[in-house]
């Protein structure tokens, strides 16, 4: 059984952190409706969705991916690079402790889960404004005993590594080559986004299908031409908060 931990949309999401986007008004009821539809897509993909309550004083807390990394053997609670997000970690640890032994990234290191891409036993971490060398080295020390390798990857022009690349299918990644070099990921099939859709590289592979934003029809055509099944979702309000489909859940085997 796949577990998907999510968290409700904060009433304060309009005050979210923004790095590469201009602030726009966010329709809170619509954002919450889109989030519920996203949870339904996870359930259709075979996940048992465990929705945590919204944290109205923590604007970015719907983006649970950034505060933890869950492997088969252990869960790592991160130390987010944005000061405003660090209180979120105390709220995710209890939910994870039901399933895994939990460890924590320690100061002064910083690490955002959005910078962490796992491909089998290989873990890639974006060198970003949110994840530093200390955080990456701490992650490496935690996962090495379980047989994982950790490789730091340069990125440019985007918030997180998974803004630039995500797993699209077994042995394939969806990538924006302007933001990351696909060669960093070795012998995988690289499907490039349509250059007119720079934010289109983020999809969530669950149950053999890719949960994918409706906002990127050109790139969706490329994915479908590559034989990848798409589960479309509308996350337009969450995208205004610099979020994407991987950001809104932690998916792992029970």
Where are the regions that the model predicts?
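The feature marks the mature, well-folded catalytic cores of soluble enzymes
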Residues: 1-254
